[in-house]
Amino acid sequence: TKVTGAASGTSWRGVPSTFAPSNGKWYFELSGSGSYILIGAGSADTGQSQWFELTSIASNSTKAKMMYSYNGGIYGYNSSTDAWQYGFGFGHGTAYNVGVAVDLDNGHMYFSKDGAAYTDSGDPTSGSTGTGAIDLPWYDTESTVFIVTVANSGSTSLLNFGGYTSGSISSAASDANGYGTFEYAPPSGYYALCGKNLAEFG
């Protein structure tokens, strides 16, 4: 999935995943360029149409947790008072690969950049403890979609759930079941979002 922001304007273009799992541990990657990208997870009960065209982050993120590449902050669930909790800046105009590990068995999400350690010393394998995790408050009552949105100024994102990607992959890492093609290996216990894995874990 490729999403590109316009050269000017204020609209946010969003793309939600077509799968909306309720359980399991999932890994996907974002290859991005530019400072105006949001990546994360949201409640499927909100409705996919909300994520296609966001005109305001604040008014459209009542059930989502997303990382903003402008300064690496986490925009959060319910109101702007939950925003910018963690410092994890990407830098402006640079290319990067973001790994996203979503634990829907325990309601946690983790981000890494370019295969390095997870932000806030996060440990995706910490289970219910959620070491360094970003909490997903809706996880035990609603299904979850994974979302990428891009704003103006020409920012571009390529989202890879492990299947077809228009970006280049140099290392071709897969999950423990042998599915997916990622730049970096998924954490232990996390899987590519595909039909066969969903049937087993989702």
Residue locations for each model-derived region?
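PRY/SPRY (B30.2) beta-sandwich protein-interaction domains
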Residues: T1-G202
